Amino acid sequence: MAKNQINFTKMSKEASTQLKSFKESALALAVEDLRFKAEMKPLKAQLESILANRQNDIDNGLPVDEVIAKFPRTEVDNAIRKAQTTHEAIIEPLNKTMRDTYAFIPENMYLAYTKKIDEHKRGDFLTAISDFLTNLGIDGCTQGQISKLAENMSDMFGARYAQSKKIVENGTMHTAISKAQFNKLFMAVFCDMYIK
């Protein structure tokens, strides 16, 4: 093992299980998202067709009540609602499983990240990375190991284009991502890089 590599085999069994659950949930969410989009695409097309036909007949002078009866959308609306309900029932426990893994992220991690983005100060971020490793059950890392991990992970994080309000009020054109986005991204980057 190279000098600046962290021995992740020291990770607690609970942490290892949670991180694997994060990866499995992320994959399951992606699969479900694709399934849901595939199911919704023809339903949305069907609804758009009904609405276009309705508008065409209304534009041609037919009474609204007659047009609604001629092109009912109840069946499509019910199918859309059913698809959405099924989708939400599938993703809810997966999202919860992912959020449960955020327990390993120190409370100050997001604040340290925003300080790194906004003020270009890394010290708090390095401390938060060290705390994260401790939360995983990995103690005794050197400053070099922590710095290397922080640097490797930081390459995957970023800022985003600021909203108009922030640009106008502060003259700042970039900003940190939200805490929810950061937590999800942090765990995803960590798992991609270090959990096999």
List where the protein language model places each region.
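Short, charge/polar-rich alpha-helical segments
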Residues: 5-42
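Extended alpha-helical coiled-coil "stalk/arm" regions
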Residues: 29-108
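Short intrinsically disordered terminal tails
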Residues: 1-3, 195-196
